[in-house]
Amino acid sequence: MTERTESQKSGLSTRIISSVSGFLEAIVTLLPADAGGRIGPIAPRDGNYCPALRRALPDAPSIPIRFIEGPPWIAPGQDGRVVVEIEDGALDCAGFASGVELELVEGKRVVGILTVLRLWREAMVG
């Protein structure tokens, strides 16, 4: 019998973003569990919470992200200031401007809202 990891139990996959093209500083607001949000809190500083972002439009593409900084815990129904990594190539199609609100999704379920405060583009070193 194999032991399941916490990410397998929750239905989330932990993925490594191999090529990062930018970072977002943002306010994330998690929906309460009774409004369809997560049951448990997230730990932004751990670097293993990897949901996706998308615009609130029909058929909008999902953009993989990874939380890398923020408060120790953010529980459902709470908010916090965070920094997330954005997968390479997603910056060109997303239009991350200050004040833009994006859905935070796990699979197909919306679990929160992310409000962009600032975008940093990674410098290429060669």
Residue ranges of model-derived segments:
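C-terminal effector/interaction modules appended to NTPase cores
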Residues: 2-126
